[in-house]
């Protein structure tokens, strides 16, 4: 298998319910439009000069392997609020960047604050200058069915 450095990326987030926690996770992926592909989990370094997309490319083949950084949480505890967030930091000159993920029993704002702090620290320890910060998140309060919150950065080789 040959891996190609991704050229484009998109940030997505969704929350959903399902008959089981795994079905809730799958339903959140379907809401994002990535439920019929294989997510290949990555660590959190963004290639230089990546282009950020506003919408998913059309006609992504079923079963395609997509490099992904994602955070997720599932719960079946009624009344619990769960959130997932991804923070993306882009360096000056778009020479690369970092993605940090967080998921927990919390409100969306808490998850977003957490990833912002992580991105800032990641840049500081590398001696990089943060030019831009982006965040994507999802929140849901569990009712009668299990629920999931998922946030993802999907990368494309084309």
Curated annotation (Swiss-Prot):
GO BP annotations, alphabetical order = arginine catabolic process
Recorded hits in Gene3D superfamilies, A to Z, give: 3.30.60.30, Pyruvoyl-Dependent Histidine Decarboxylase, subunit B
Q: How is the cofactor bound?
A: Binds 1 pyruvoyl group covalently per subunit.
Annotated positions for site Cleavage (non-hydrolytic): 43-44
Q: Which residues carry this modification: Pyruvic acid (Ser)?
A: 44
SUPFAM superfamilies attached to this UniProt entry = Pyruvoyl-dependent histidine and arginine decarboxylases
Q: Which reaction does it catalyse?
A: L-arginine + H(+) = agmatine + CO2
| InterPro entries, sorted | Pyr-dep_his/arg-deCO2ase (IPR016104), Pyr-dep_his/arg-deCO2ase_sand (IPR016105), Pyruvoyl-dep_arg_deCO2ase (IPR002724)
One molecular function GO term is: arginine decarboxylase activity
EC number(s) on file: 4.1.1.19
The cofactor named in the record is: pyruvate
- UniProt keyword list: Decarboxylase, Lyase, Pyruvate
Q: Which NCBIfam families match?
A: pyruvoyl-dependent arginine decarboxylase
Q: Which family does it belong to?
A: Belongs to the PdaD family.
* Protein's name in the database: Pyruvoyl-dependent arginine decarboxylase
Q: What is the lineage of its organism?
A: Archaea, Methanobacteriati, Methanobacteriota, Thermococci, Thermococcales
